[in-house]
UniProtKB/Swiss-Prot annotation:
Subunit structure comment from the entry: Monomer. Interacts with GGA2 and GGA3. Binds to clathrin and activated ARFs, including ARF1, ARF5 and ARF6. Interacts with RABEP1. Interacts with RABGEF1. Interacts with the type-I membrane proteins LRP3, M6PR/CD-MPR and IGF2R/CI-MPR. Interacts (via N-terminal VHS domain) with SORL1/sorLA and SORT1 (via C-terminal cytosolic domain). Interacts with EPN4. Interacts with CCDC91. Interacts with HEATR5B/p200a. Interacts with SYNRG/gamma-synergin. Interacts (via GAE doamin) with NECAP1 and NECAP2. Interacts (via GAE domain) with AFTPH/aftiphilin. Interacts with TSG101 and UBC. Interacts with RNF11.
Subcellular location: Golgi apparatus, trans-Golgi network membrane; Endosome membrane; Early endosome membrane
Keyword ATP-binding listed: no
Pfam families: Alpha_adaptinC2, GAT, GGA_N-GAT, VHS
UniProt-recorded name of the protein: ADP-ribosylation factor-binding protein GGA1
GO biological process, one term: protein localization to cell surface
Gene expressing this chain: GGA1
Sequence segments annotated as region (Interaction with ARF3): 114-274
Lineage of the species this protein comes from: Eukaryota, Metazoa, Chordata, Craniata, Vertebrata
Entry GO CC: cytosol; early endosome; early endosome membrane; endosome membrane; Golgi apparatus; intracellular membrane-bounded organelle; membrane; nucleoplasm
């Protein structure tokens, strides 16, 4: 008896479909590749990696065949594959082939024209994939695309078949199985179809019960929050509170505390519905704020080291001016920050970690890097990676530097939406619940040996200082391409990010949906944007980095670093921890939070590159990526 043949791998199919010895296109292999791509759970990410390698082949015929496979898959493989192609990771590989900086000078015109034709067709046919449109527009700005190519008639994307309106039949696998069973004439198949229909109806009933439970829970939370807020504010304004009112406030407070785990369970059950998650997390934010408000104003307790009513709506003075902690630990291997003029720069690690995204996709709308004003460790137009273990140059050195003429803001703007598919909002649940322990809370009155102005004083003095847009520019390690103007008034030392620390409990989240920065191996990192700006520093965006784990193993030695172009500045405050326990669905999960400050005086479009290292089990991971889904800089003062 012959052994059963093992199914072919995607790699074997792509090798056969793009074989340079093929006399013509092997449509059987191409279609087989597309079909298996759809069937495999990890098909789309693996397929894009294989295709990127084949497209960069020095043999024209092999590259053309690979592009044909890519085009066929885009037309027949659906949204999962579209999402992978629409990521900068894959688009960057296509840009390499057409860019003269990389492989463009060695690539035939036929291959380059085919790539540009595909990019343009996807821009027209898939408008929801905004990153593809961004990449294509960047190529036009760089002059690589002179004019839009003329598309053949068969290039237009066919409209996808409408999904069944009945939610019960939205599970494609079960729908196909049900259709097959119903077509059968065997009694066993008909009984199986009947059983399957009952299961699908029961699943739909459970789904409706979850929706009803979620709606009722959110409504109850909102009502309790509204009532408790009104009573606490009335109490804080000197209103005479009767004993019954105090009892009612206490009862509402206890009810709000009991709703916290309920909201978390709802968020865990609503992972695939972004709008529902946003409602749950907004309700949780409101719940946390009113609980802290009650503790501060009614009980007079300190909330994470802050006895002031920093959560009162409308208060903008809760962000204290705290000096940073930042001394590099012994043995650190991360790139050091740029040094002051006259000091010896520490050797930097090889620049292999800076990928083509720095020059291409991460530099959309930016001109070539401008020469730095002092010795720089990074020649790519980017600041070195910053972490909470790195420190900025001392502020007095900055005060001696003359202000430089700021160049005009870039004309590019952030896309209106980068797609809810890139968002995972679960971590925001723990934004207010996972604050740093008191041992890591920095208090300005205990830390600073010498007097230092607070941000409230800075706000009062802002009229006598130079405007933020011009004075903050001199904090950046860059100069304008034009000759500097004569020295002007020195930059106030308190404008340095080194002297600013924002307590996590004083941050109020904005209505902007969080951005998923990293989501692999059961480890998620999200960016939450603060609602209120720093007093006197509308050029600074406050971001809360939230890290949480659904991995079955504990995660240790977590280090998150960030870097921005030299026209900006970034600072990471110490994280609330460096370890996350193994996920337990019964126990309330913990999270790590870290405050990130981003200065952007010239209001350029933000492009942030991150480096993440962590250990899971016996394996150490070193991850890098980029984030560009930031609010437009013009809106930072009123998010």
């Amino acid at each position: 008896m012959e052994p059963a043949m093992e199914p072919e791998t995607l790699e074997a199919r792509i090798n056969r479909a793009t074989n340079p010895l093929n006399k013509e296109l092997d449509w059987a292999s191409i279609n087989g590749f597309c079909e298996q791509l759809n069937e495999d759970f990890e098909g789309p990410p693996l397929a894009t990696r294989l295709l990127a390698h084949k497209i960069q082949s020095p043999q024209e015929w092999e590259a053309i065949q690979a592009l044909t496979v890519l085009e066929t898959c885009m037309k027949s493989c659906g949204k999962r594959f579209h999402d992978e192609v629409g990521k900068f990771r894959f688009l960057n590989e296509l840009i390499k082939v057409v860019s003269p900086k990389y492989l463009g000078s060695r690539t035939s015109e036929k291959v380059k024209n085919k790539i540009l034709e595909l990019l343009y067709s996807w821009t027209v046919g898939l408008p929801e994939e905004v990153k593809i449109a961004e990449a294509y527009q960047m190529l036009k700005k760089q002059g690589i695309v002179k004019s839009d190519p003329k598309l053949p008639d068969d290039t237009t994307f066919p409209l996808p078949p409408p999904r069944p309106k009945n939610v019960i039949f939205e599970d494609e696998e079960k729908s196909k199985m049900l259709a097959r069973l119903l077509k059968s004439s065997h009694p066993e198949d008909l009984r199986a179809a009947n059983k399957l229909i009952k299961e699908m109806v029961q699943e739909d009933q459970k789904r409706m019960e979850k929706i009803s439970k979620r709606v009722n829970a959110i409504e109850e939370v909102n009502n309790n929050v509204k009532l408790l807020t009104e009573m606490v504010m009335s109490h804080s304004q000197g209103g005479a509170a009767a004993g019954s009112s105090e009892d009612l406030m206490k009862e509402l407070y206890q009810r709000c505390e009991r709703m916290r785990p309920t909201l978390f369970r709802l968020a865990s059950d609503t992972e695939d519905n972004d709008e529902a998650l946003a409602e749950i997390l907004q309700a949780n934010d409101n719940l946390t704020q009113v609980i802290n408000l009650y503790k501060q104003l009614v009980r007079g307790e300190e909330v994470n080291g802050d006895a002031t009513a920093g959560s009162i709506p409308g208060s903008t003075s809760a962000l204290l001016d705290l000096s940073g902690l930042d001394l590099p630990p012994a043995g650190t291997t991360y790139p050091a920050m740029p040094t002051r003029p006259g000091e010896q720069a520490s050797p930097e690690q090889p620049s292999a970690s800076v990928s083509l995204l720095d020059d291409e996709l991460m530099s959309l709308g930016l001109s070539d890097p401008t020469p730095p004003s002092g010795p720089s460790l990074d020649g790519t137009g980017w600041n070195s990676f910053q972490s909470s273990d790195a420190t900025e140059p001392p502020a007095p050195a900055l005060a001696q530097a003359p202000s430089m003429e700021s160049r005009p803001p870039a004309q590019t703007s952030l896309p209106a939406s980068s797609g809810l598919d890139d968002l995972d909002l679960l971590g925001k649940t723990l934004l207010q619940q996972s604050l740093p322990p008191e041992s890591q809370q920095v208090r300005w009155e205990k830390q600073q040996p010498t007097p230092r102005l607070t941000l409230r004083d800075l706000q009062n003095k802002s009229s006598s200082c130079s405007s933020p847009s011009s004075s903050a520019t001199s904090l950046l390690h860059t100069v304008s391409p034009e000759p500097p103007r004569p020295p002007q008034q020195p930059v106030p030392t308190e404008l340095s990010l080194a002297s600013i620390t924002v307590p996590l409990e004083s941050i109020k989240p904005s209505n902007i949906l969080p951005v998923t920065v990293y989501d692999q191996h059961g480890f998620r990192i999200l960016f939450h944007f603060a609602r209120d700006p720093l007093p006197g520093r509308s050029d600074v965006l406050v971001v809360v980095v939230s890290m949480l784990s659904t991995a079955p193993q504990p995660i240790r030695n977590i280090v998150f670093q960030s870097a921005v172009p030299k026209v900006m500045k970034v600072k990471l405050q110490p994280p609330s921890g460096t370890e996350l326990p193994a996920f337990n669905p019964i126990v309330h999960p913990s999270a790590i939070t870290q405050v990130l400050l981003l200065a952007n005086p010239q209001k350029e479009k933000v492009r942030l590159r991150y480096k993440l290292t962590f250990t899971m089990g016996d394996q150490t991971y070193n991850e890098m990526g980029d984030v560009d889904q930031f609010p437009p800089p013009e809106t930072w003062g009123s998010l």
